[in-house]
Amino acid sequence: MKRTFQPSNTSRKRTHGFLVRMATKNGRLVIKRRRAKGRKNLAVRIATK
């Protein structure tokens, strides 16, 4: 049986990215909560070299 986590930066950004969060009301609430908590990263950010 193959493992469930098959990492891909594309699908990661498409489902958990900042623009996707901002697109819906509930997504904006997620960002709001993370701002209030003082998170350094509000949404998934793919590291670049």
From Swiss-Prot:
GO terms for biological process: translation. It holds the Pfam family Ribosomal_L34. InterPro entries: Ribosomal_bL34, Ribosomal_bL34_CS. GO terms for molecular function: structural constituent of ribosome. The keyword Ribonucleoprotein applies. The keyword Ribosomal protein applies. Disulfide bonds: none annotated. One of its GO terms (cellular component) is ribonucleoprotein complex. Keywords: Ribonucleoprotein, Ribosomal protein. HAMAP family: Ribosomal_bL34. Belongs to the bacterial ribosomal protein bL34 family. This is Large ribosomal subunit protein bL34. It comes from Pelobacter propionicus (strain DSM 2379 / NBRC 103807 / OttBd1).
